Amino acid sequence: MINSTYDEEAVLDNTTADATATVDTTTATVEAEPTSRLPRWLRAPQPKPLRPQKEVDKLYPRLRFQVFIGIFIGYASFYLIRNNVSLVANTLSENGLSKTDIGIIANCLLLAYGFSKFFAATISDRANARFFMPLGLILSGLTNILIGISAGGTISVSIFAVLMTINGIFQGMGWPPAGRVMVHWFSTSERGGKMALWNITHNVGGALSGALVAYALDHFGSDNWASAFWFPAVICFILAIITFFLVRDNPQSMGLPSIEEYHNDPAPVEIDEADKTESTWQTIRRHILRNPTMVYLAFANVFVYTLRYGIVSWAPLYLAQVRGGSTSQGIAGFSIFEISGIIGTLLCGWISDRVFKGRRSVTGIVFMVGVILAVLLYWLPSNDAPMWVSWTALALAGGLIYGPVMLIGLQALDLSPTHIAGTAAGFTGLFGYALGATMASTGIGAIAQHMGWGAAFIFLIICAVLSIVLLGLVDRKEKEILAKARAKRDAVRATQEENATAEETKTAEAELES
């Protein structure tokens, strides 16, 4: 079934020879794509001659749907083998690990992931997403197999930490190719809704991770925590193959026009003349490292990720040890947080596009205020309160926090040229994971152990306030960029209407003369 669905490249290549007389042989160029020293099989594919308009209109929608499903399945799969330490935190604690030990192990993955997401993005922007994403998933799966193998006997914190670091490096190969595919196949004006829909991969993957781990512990024994790593990894190998068959890197490599041309929707930040002559590093430095708006966005991501991981990573342990729940109830809280994020993410994307007209920062601020209220509900009830109270608070927190998580990644794509969009998103991700996730794992673990959970919750609320301030700073520049993009789009459409009117007038005059 897969082969019959995904062999369009071979079919289309065969039809090209028969349609030589009608095919526009103008090459569909990928403007200013960086040069690459990657192995030939991993490089971004070269553009092919443009296909006839009838063929373009038939193929474009189908491939857009196909690649979207591909990056959805692919990125959700990474989550099946990412945050599994948190899911077995209570079991690890019963086996002698302290909160600080667990925090360090979890932080090794998050820290490595943050750096990898940035540096992998600089490679991914020159690589074929069809190969790059499945490759990272397979390598991450193999690392989780090694974690399961090394689990026999006494738990070694150092070995565990090293393997989680390696896992984090390969995990960083997931988001950048997905972001690259998103900017090449979906235009700016539609990207809010599409990005929101794709972003629920965080929640789908996270929730399925909890379900797979719960099944593994139930089937292979509640003390067999190694199964929480190797069992989901086996599933990921299959999903990596499916991802490979679905994903296509960019429209031009399929003989299609760019999405900006196809939808008449220019990018907010276009490739300029300097981008075409300077090195990739010079472009990154100019558009990202020396761009105050991008720096504000990166620091906002620090505090958003502190809240995201500070809540969900410690939920299984907090619910078991403080709220008196079982291990399964703690894992249920983790999954509730993730599942609720689906609704919140979709709602956030809709509000961002329809209510605030693309002003992502304002939408993020509104959602972060809601996160503060959810954290208070999670913290303030007495320890003997029913478990549904804590689950409700986690549902609200998950539904609200994933909106800003999605928006910041989307803003990084919107506020940078397409050929370094993945790197821009990787830059904000680097800050989110290297700093935010560190504070969420090691930081909150140390605060809770030495100062109590009350101090940890106060810390989370402070982080939420700081994220609101930084998003306010980003909003000022965002308004300016959006105004320029709308003016340009309106000018192009006005010109097209004038040309169409002139053509109609010319045709009418010709008919009168005849």
Question: PLM features: residue spans?
Answer:
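Cytoplasmic membrane-interface "Motif A"-like loop-to-helix N-cap segments
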Residues: 126-137, 354-368
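Juxtamembrane intracellular "pre-TM" segments in multi-pass secondary transporters
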Residues: 48-61, 254-296, 492
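Helix-loop-helix hairpin linking two adjacent transmembrane segments in secondary transporters
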Residues: 198-252
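Cytoplasmic helix-loop-helix junction between adjacent transmembrane helices
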Residues: 163-201
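C-terminal ends and interior cores of transmembrane alpha-helices
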Residues: 138-154, 369-383
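Extracytoplasmic gate region of multi-pass secondary transporters
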Residues: 85-87, 290-346, 405, 437-441
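C-terminal transmembrane helical hairpin of 12-TM major facilitator-type secondary transporters
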Residues: 358-408
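Glycine-rich segments within core transmembrane alpha-helices of 12-TM secondary carriers
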Residues: 192-213, 217, 341, 429-440
